[in-house]
Protein backbone atom coordinates (compact mmCIF):
# COMPACT_ATOMS: atom_id res chain seq x y z
CA UNK A 1 0.00 0.00 0.00
CA UNK A 2 1.48 3.27 -1.18
CA UNK A 3 0.52 6.78 -0.09
CA UNK A 4 0.78 9.36 -2.88
CA UNK A 5 0.77 13.10 -2.24
CA UNK A 6 -0.55 14.85 -5.35
CA UNK A 7 0.08 18.61 -5.24
CA UNK A 8 1.95 21.27 -7.17
CA UNK A 9 1.64 23.74 -4.28
CA UNK A 10 4.76 24.08 -2.14
CA UNK A 11 2.78 25.47 0.80
CA UNK A 12 0.59 22.35 0.87
CA UNK A 13 3.64 20.08 0.71
CA UNK A 14 5.32 22.03 3.53
CA UNK A 15 2.14 21.95 5.64
CA UNK A 16 1.70 18.19 5.20
CA UNK A 17 5.35 17.64 6.13
CA UNK A 18 5.06 19.97 9.15
CA UNK A 19 1.91 18.20 10.37
CA UNK A 20 3.66 14.85 10.19
CA UNK A 21 1.47 13.19 7.57
CA UNK A 22 3.55 10.48 5.97
CA UNK A 23 3.58 9.76 2.27
CA UNK A 24 5.68 7.52 0.07
CA UNK A 25 5.72 9.44 -3.19
CA UNK A 26 5.08 13.06 -4.22
CA UNK A 27 3.50 13.72 -7.62
CA UNK A 28 2.78 17.16 -9.05
CA UNK A 29 0.07 15.69 -11.28
CA UNK A 30 -1.79 12.38 -11.44
CA UNK A 31 -1.08 11.42 -15.06
CA UNK A 32 -2.86 8.08 -15.09
CA UNK A 33 -4.03 5.41 -12.71
CA UNK A 34 -1.75 2.58 -13.94
CA UNK A 35 0.59 2.78 -10.94
CA UNK A 36 -2.27 2.80 -8.42
CA UNK A 37 -3.49 -0.35 -6.71
CA UNK A 38 -6.36 -1.28 -4.43
CA UNK A 39 -5.41 -0.24 -0.91
CA UNK A 40 -3.30 2.74 -1.99
CA UNK A 41 -4.05 6.23 -0.68
CA UNK A 42 -3.99 9.50 -2.60
CA UNK A 43 -3.76 12.78 -0.65
CA UNK A 44 -4.46 16.06 -2.42
CA UNK A 45 -7.07 18.54 -3.64
CA UNK A 46 -8.39 16.71 -6.66
CA UNK A 47 -11.60 17.23 -8.67
CA UNK A 48 -14.58 15.13 -7.63
CA UNK A 49 -14.67 13.10 -10.87
CA UNK A 50 -11.10 11.96 -10.30
CA UNK A 51 -11.90 11.07 -6.69
CA UNK A 52 -14.78 8.92 -7.98
CA UNK A 53 -12.37 7.17 -10.36
CA UNK A 54 -9.89 6.54 -7.55
CA UNK A 55 -12.53 5.19 -5.19
CA UNK A 56 -13.85 2.86 -7.92
CA UNK A 57 -10.32 1.42 -8.13
CA UNK A 58 -10.27 0.77 -4.38
CA UNK A 59 -7.95 3.71 -3.69
CA UNK A 60 -8.60 5.78 -0.56
CA UNK A 61 -8.77 9.54 -1.12
CA UNK A 62 -7.80 12.06 1.55
CA UNK A 63 -8.54 15.70 0.78
CA UNK A 64 -6.63 18.75 1.95
CA UNK A 65 -9.70 20.64 3.13
CA UNK A 66 -9.95 24.31 3.99
CA UNK A 67 -12.22 27.28 3.53
CA UNK A 68 -10.41 29.96 1.56
CA UNK A 69 -11.66 33.54 1.92
CA UNK A 70 -12.32 35.39 -1.31
CA UNK A 71 -9.30 37.67 -0.90
CA UNK A 72 -6.95 34.64 -0.87
CA UNK A 73 -8.39 32.84 -3.90
CA UNK A 74 -5.72 32.28 -6.52
CA UNK A 75 -2.94 33.05 -4.05
CA UNK A 76 -0.16 30.52 -3.35
CA UNK A 77 -0.68 29.84 0.34
CA UNK A 78 2.17 29.09 2.72
CA UNK A 79 2.14 26.34 5.32
CA UNK A 80 1.57 29.03 7.96
CA UNK A 81 -1.46 30.39 6.09
CA UNK A 82 -2.88 26.87 5.72
CA UNK A 83 -2.54 26.38 9.48
CA UNK A 84 -4.18 29.76 10.14
CA UNK A 85 -7.08 28.70 7.88
CA UNK A 86 -7.48 25.47 9.90
CA UNK A 87 -6.59 23.18 7.02
CA UNK A 88 -7.10 19.50 7.68
CA UNK A 89 -6.91 16.16 5.92
CA UNK A 90 -10.31 14.50 5.51
CA UNK A 91 -11.11 11.14 3.93
CA UNK A 92 -13.80 11.14 1.24
CA UNK A 93 -15.55 8.38 -0.63
CA UNK A 94 -17.24 9.42 -3.87
CA UNK A 95 -19.45 7.25 -6.04
CA UNK A 96 -20.48 8.29 -9.53
CA UNK A 97 -24.22 7.84 -10.04
CA UNK A 98 -25.76 6.61 -13.30
Residue ranges and their predicted role:
Residues 24-32, 48, 65-71:
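Short, acidic/turn-prone active-site loops that include or flank metal/cofactor-
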Residues 1, 33-40:
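Flexible, charged surface loops at secondary-structure boundaries
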Residues 12-13, 33, 50-52:
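Short, well-ordered alpha-helical microsegments
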Residues 60-98:
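Ser/Thr/Gly-rich flexible loops in soluble cytosolic domains mediating phosphotransfer, phosphorylation
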Residues 1-27:
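Short, charged N-terminal beta->alpha structural module
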Residues 17-18, 54-57:
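Short amphipathic alpha-helical segments
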Residues 47, 52-53, 61:
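Extended, well-folded catalytic/binding cores that form a central cleft or groove in large enzyme
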Residues 6-8, 40-46:
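Short His-Asn-centered micro-motif
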Amino acid sequence: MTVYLVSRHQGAIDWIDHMGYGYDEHLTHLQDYAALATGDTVVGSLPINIVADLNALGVTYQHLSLYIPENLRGVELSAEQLSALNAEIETYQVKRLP
